[in-house]
Amino acid sequence: GTGTAVGIAGGLFHMLNHAVYKSTLFLCAGVVEKRAGTTEMDRLGGLAKLMPWTFAGTLVGALAISGIPPLNGFASKWMVYQGIIVSGKDDGTLWVIWLAAAMLGSALTLASFVKVLHATYLCKPTTAITRRNIRDAGVAMGIPIVFLAAVCIVFGVFPTALPVRFFIEPAVGTIAFS
């Protein structure tokens, strides 16, 4: 870690956010597997029209994990980036490499999820799988997806008012800095 207050807070916030957006993505993948009978992307396609709520949840989760504003992944990654910059102000130029590596990781994550979104939801169906009676998540599967996607948005739009204030600051406040 960066050892700075903002870096530690950013790391804790990112752990919380990771649990939220990764859970969203896993739930959406589960719905796709349950409804389509496969998670092989080359056998899917065109599911956005058949599963709009699942597509929306996957889209929010993918953008959040990639650090796109105004979602929660951006807010915590921004704090981590600030921690890198603050910790590097007295250490020469090594911080630039760490910052570039972190940003490159986010860009590569976005690229991978663009492929997932396109192959699963947006491209023309490659097999007869989408001609089956595929439907979106039911209420029991859909409510958690919608709730977690909403948390991704709320934690991104109001990062300091909600998660940082109530979860992160109390934890960071207990750490003694030298």
Regions found by a protein language model. Name each.
Residues 1-3, 77-99:
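Interfacial segments of multi-pass membrane proteins
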Residues 49-58, 135-150:
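Alpha-helical transmembrane segments and their helix-start/interface "positive-inside/aromatic belt" motifs
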Residues 22-26, 95-133:
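Predominantly late transmembrane helices and immediately cytosolic-facing juxtamembrane segments
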Residues 14, 36-46, 119-136:
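Alpha-helical transmembrane segments
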Residues 11, 15, 31, 59-65, ...:
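Hydrophobic alpha-helical transmembrane segments of multi-pass small-molecule transporters/permeases
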Residues 79-87, 162-178:
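Membrane-interfacial helical/loop segments at transmembrane boundaries in membrane proteins
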Residues 58-69, 144-163:
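Hydrophobic alpha-helical membrane-insertion segments
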Residues 1-41:
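Alpha-helical multi-pass transmembrane bundles of energy-transducing inner-membrane proteins
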